[in-house]
Each structure stands twice: as C-alpha cells, then as structure tokens.
C-alpha cells in the first residue's frame, strides 16, 4: 500500500519544486549557482573592459568647465585664460559645419556676412536680389545707390546775370563804367541813358570826362519809395559784400589793390565833377545850402573820406524823367527832409571850409564789370538818413 504522503518526500521528488524551492535542496541547485556566478563575472569583465565615456581631452574640458562654474558661483570674474579654449572650440565648430567662413554667422559677430561681396545688396526683403555689380566705393550699384536720398528738389540758380570776363586792370575807368552799366539787367534806364554814347562802349555819363561819372541829362535817381537792400543784392547771387565809405563792394574787389586803386581814382574824379554837373536844383529854397555854390572844386576834393555806417537803399528802381520836368525834380527828393533851422545841426565841425557845407552827400560807387551797380546815400551828422 502506498504511503499517502510519499510525494512529500524529498527523495521521491526528483523534479524541482516551483512552490517552495527554498524548503528543499535539489541535487541540481549547486550547479545552477556556479553557472550564475560565472555569468555575472563575465558581465562584470565586459563592463570593465568597455572604453570610458569621455576621452582625456573631454575630461580636461569637463574639469575646466567645472572650474568656471565654481568661479561663477563664487561671484568672481572668470580669468581670460579659461575662456580662450572655449572660444577656439566654438570657432572650430563653426568652421566644421560651415565650410565657407562667410556663409555662417561665425563667433562673436552681430550679423550675417555677405556671401557675394561684389554684388549689389538691393533686395525686396525676400529672395530677390539685384544681379548687377556694386560700385567700387559702395555696396549698391549705380541704379540703387541714390534711392534712399531725398532728390525731389533741384538747386535753383539764384544768379540772374551771366558772369562776364574781368577786364584788365590797366583799362580806362570809363570803359569799365560803361560795361558795368550796359551789362547790368536791373538798371536799363542807366544803361541806355548815355546822351552821346547810347548803347555803345562810351561812359555812362554822356559827355563826362574819361575816368569820371556824372548823371546824364536823361537819367535821374528817384528814391521816393523805400526798398530793401535785397533788390540790388538779388542779382548778385551768393557774392560777399562789405560796406565801405563809397558804397557796397564785393569782397573779391577789396583784396585786389589794383582794382581798389582804380575805383578810388574814378570816385575821386567823379566827386570833383559832381557839383558842377548835378547842381541844377534851386539853392534859394534850401537855407542850409546857401553857400554851397561858393565852394570850389578844390575844396570839395580836399574833404576827408568819412567812414559811414552800413546804409540802406531807398527807392525801388531808376527811372527816366522827361527833360521838361528835369529842372524842378533834379535831386529834390534827397533834400526834402532837411531841417530848416541851423539849430538842428548841433555837432557840425568848426572848420571854416565845412561850416556852411552840409554833410549830406551823394556818392556812386562803380565796381568792376562782374559786380553789381551799387548806390549809397550818406548820413547827416544828426543821424537822419537822407532820402
């Protein structure tokens, strides 16, 4: 008869028990443990024989980065010798990925470099780009070079009179005077007012002596309406004018001693001849000019040249007056506002030659042919401008 619990005997059971393996020891258990240990040893040997995850250079770089991290944590500035290898590594990395150096951004550059330096850089903001060659000193071609500049307004030529060739300094002053009057477009009345010369090359005074200028019989100066100096200076363009004792002269004329000497000579001669040719007004109607006719030409020529302040021009233009009305209107507008009493002249000179002579004078300055005609009216001693 079989035993009921025979299956529970370890000797009867040759199969390994999956339920309680620890309760019994099978004869094959020792062999399995040895094989398991052998497998684990083989795995460990394979793990030990495997190469390390970092190379020696990578370990060195890792140590360097750890040192930089320690500097950053401590709040101490990182030395430059620790940052140079990192910069070189970034440069080598950029050259590895971008074979052409201009195609990449590169290290420490703010913008992308131009892949085609010699080509015009005008684009539409997308893929299109101008195919023309750029100018030598510009990054754009000739067509696109001035696109961004404001060129809506062109410069306006302010000079109204065409420049003329400068005559030699040895030419007579009368020829210079006639050329200056006839070529000036702002004063046709004076240019055509010569009595005997007309539009020719003679003096503008019509009958005056060479080297002098006097008002012609058909030309008078009327300065009734006040006009600014810009009416005369508008035809001069951008010339530099300066005030002098005998009118407004260009700056270029002041630097030439020969021209200045010729002008002074012409002015002095015309000043000597001025009273005899323009003194056609009635002296009796002006008490202050009672003894003007007594002064001879030598006394007038010996008068000193008084420096005057910058003057204003009165009158808008020069007009021609009929010969019938010439006797009553000659130079009268210049003396309408003179004081009638002698007490109004407190600071007259005590000189005998100047005691009865008014300080109000009329002088006409005649520059060269390339300059503009200028007229000055002097100022009286009490500060009143004559008109």
Swiss-Prot record:
<dbReference type="GO" id="GO:0006351">
    <property type="term" value="P:DNA-templated transcription"/>
</dbReference>
<feature type="short sequence motif" description="Bipartite nuclear localization signal">
    <location>
        <begin position="111"/>
        <end position="129"/>
    </location>
</feature>
<dbReference type="GO" id="GO:0005524">
    <property type="term" value="F:ATP binding"/>
</dbReference>
<keyword id="KW-0010">Activator</keyword>
<feature type="region of interest" description="Disordered">
    <location>
        <begin position="145"/>
        <end position="176"/>
    </location>
</feature>
<dbReference type="InterPro" id="IPR031137">
    <property type="entry name" value="GRF"/>
</dbReference>
<keyword id="KW-0805">Transcription regulation</keyword>
<comment type="similarity">
    <text>Belongs to the GRF family.</text>
</comment>
<dbReference type="GO" id="GO:0032502">
    <property type="term" value="P:developmental process"/>
</dbReference>
<keyword id="KW-0539">Nucleus</keyword>
<dbReference type="GO" id="GO:0006355">
    <property type="term" value="P:regulation of DNA-templated transcription"/>
</dbReference>
<feature type="domain" description="WRC">
    <location>
        <begin position="114"/>
        <end position="158"/>
    </location>
</feature>
<comment type="function">
    <text>Transcription activator that plays a regulatory role in gibberellin-induced stem elongation.</text>
</comment>
<feature type="domain" description="QLQ">
    <location>
        <begin position="53"/>
        <end position="88"/>
    </location>
</feature>
<dbReference type="GO" id="GO:0005634">
    <property type="term" value="C:nucleus"/>
</dbReference>
<protein>
    <recommendedName>
        <fullName>Growth-regulating factor 3</fullName>
    </recommendedName>
</protein>
<keyword id="KW-0804">Transcription</keyword>
<dbReference type="InterPro" id="IPR014977">
    <property type="entry name" value="WRC_dom"/>
</dbReference>
<feature type="short sequence motif" description="Bipartite nuclear localization signal">
    <location>
        <begin position="147"/>
        <end position="154"/>
    </location>
</feature>
<dbReference type="InterPro" id="IPR014978">
    <property type="entry name" value="Gln-Leu-Gln_QLQ"/>
</dbReference>
<dbReference type="Pfam" id="PF08879">
    <property type="entry name" value="WRC"/>
</dbReference>
<dbReference type="Pfam" id="PF08880">
    <property type="entry name" value="QLQ"/>
</dbReference>
